[in-house]
Amino acid sequence: MHTIFNHVKMIAENGFAKDINFVEKFDPSLPDIHGNKDLLIQVLLNLIKNSSEAIKSNSARGEITLSSSFLSSVRISLPTSNKKIELPLCFSIEDNGGGIDKEIYENIFDPFITNKKEGRGLGLSIASKIIRDHDGVIECGTTSRGTKMSILFPISD
C-alpha cells in the first residue's frame, strides 16, 4: 500500500496538488495489502484530490499527511455478518482544509452527496464500495481545521 501511496502522491504533486506540502508518516513494518492495485489507486487519488480541493477553498497553506499504522484493538461488526472482525491496518489521509459541512457530513459516503459546483457526488460513494470489496472500512473525522479519512484493512492471509 505504501507503493500505491507514493505513486498517487507523485501524480498529485505533478498535477492538481503542486502547491501542497505532503508529509509521510509510514510504518514500514506493515504487511502488504492484497487487492486490485488500480482500484486502490482510484480510491487514494479521489481522497487526495478531495483534500487538495478543500485546502484550496480554505486558502490555507496546504498540507496533506499520508500515514499508516497498526491498530491493535480495532474490532467491528459488519452489517453482513454477526461476527466481529479485526481491522488493524490503518492508512490515513489528513488535510488542513476547512473540513466537511455539517449538512452533508453524515451522508458523505452516499451517492450524489456533494458541496462542489462541478461535482457529481460519486467519488466517496465509489471509494467506500471499493474499500468494502477489499474487506475494509473507510472512516471520516472532520473539524473546521481539516479532515482525516482513514481506511482500515484486515491482515491478509
Segments the model singles out, each with a brief description of its role:
Residues M1-K9, S67-S69:
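A conserved beta-strand-to-alpha-helix junction within the catalytic ATP-binding
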Residues N21-P31, L71:
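Conserved catalytic submotifs in the C-terminal HATPase_c
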Residues D32-G35, N115:
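Conserved micro-motifs of the catalytic ATP-binding
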Residues R61-V74:
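Short beta-strand/loop element within the Bergerat-fold HATPase_c
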Residues E86-P88, I100-P111:
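Short conserved segment of the HATPase_c
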Residues G123, A127:
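Short alpha-helical Gxxx[C/S/T] motif in the catalytic ATP-binding
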Residues I131-R132:
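Detector for a conserved hydrophobic position within an alpha-helical segment of the HATPase_c
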Residues D135-G136, C140:
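Conserved glycine-rich
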